[in-house]
């Protein structure tokens, strides 16, 4: 079998195509969540906390002081951008929650397979008769 034919069979399997669609939808969903956090959630939280813009919260590890994070970045100062970390953490939590809800819904929609029937229980009389038979065969 040629390399190209093997690759075509691999690529056309349902699982590979499903995975590709999932990756594309996941990337688009990530952008939506990023916008939700940066443009809707964090401004509301910032407003409730006194007008804080989390994107611009940082700790300057350098010796000089700067008026803005952008000025410190431009000067090459070492920064701990904990505000962006907070945004990214909230992104993750929203995505994780959405995936949890989706998986839970999918599992609920799947029909669970009925459990296998229990093995038939042998009556004591049948066991006793088998033992007698086996003993008679031996002796």
UniProtKB/Swiss-Prot annotation:
GO terms for cellular component: plasma membrane. Channel that opens in response to stretch forces in the membrane lipid bilayer. May participate in the regulation of osmotic pressure changes within the cell. Its main location: membrane. The gene is mscL. Keywords: Cell inner membrane, Cell membrane, Ion channel, Ion transport, Membrane, Transmembrane, Transmembrane helix, Transport. HAMAP family: MscL. This is Large-conductance mechanosensitive channel. It is found in: Cell inner membrane. It is a multi-pass membrane protein. GO terms for molecular function: mechanosensitive monoatomic ion channel activity. The chain crosses the membrane at residues 16-36, 83-103. InterPro entries: Mechanosensitive_channel_CS, MS_channel, MSC/AndL, MscL_channel. Belongs to the MscL family. It comes from the Bacteria. Pfam families: MscL (PF01741). Homopentamer.
